[in-house]
Amino acid sequence: IFLFIEKMNKSSVFFQCFGCFKAKNKKDPVSSCFLMYGKNKFLKNEALVLSDCGVLENPDADTLASIASQSVKSAQAFGLEPRVAFLSYSSKGSAKSDAVDKVRTAYEKFKKKEKDIVCDGELQFDAAMVPSVAETKAKDSPLKGNANVLIYPDLQAGNICYKTMQYVGELNAIGPILQGLKKPVNDLSRGCSVNDIVVVSAITALQCEDKEEKKGE
């Protein structure tokens, strides 16, 4: 099921989606992720998953951990081996505040639940993405500056970052891809290209196929 409504803002689209298709699990949030890809020296021909850049404005630690779990599943569906970084303006205690504590707590909850996933937090963007910086700021991090699933502390940070990557970093941004609904439903930015529409349509079709396969198991 693919939903694209011209000239509607995201709030209107999401309101319609959530009215028609309920959450998969009442305990888990409905969130979103973006798939970022393109030629970039930091990506090394690999894509990134960014979350949540489109739905939840200010998730608490429990919700942030759930968003990360949903994003891991999305990354795996895209063929990635997820390496999750919980992002902050602090790296491993370099700053102290309630905002930093939220990110650190979310990481700890996620790590306890997803024992087989390589992850770390709280980390600054460069400590999560640049190996040479990680050696200084997060020497013992299992990510070693090679994260490919980036979990942002709130919607403002996530949305600003994906658009910066898209326009300044010249990466392709696919999404928001909705996570946590009973049926596959996705949205597109009003500034999307024809290629964006094609790719999101293909992703949504794959999500439908995945659900059908699970029904048959």
PLM feature spans:
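Anion-binding alpha/beta catalytic cores of soluble intermediary-metabolism enzymes, centered on
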Residues: 1-217
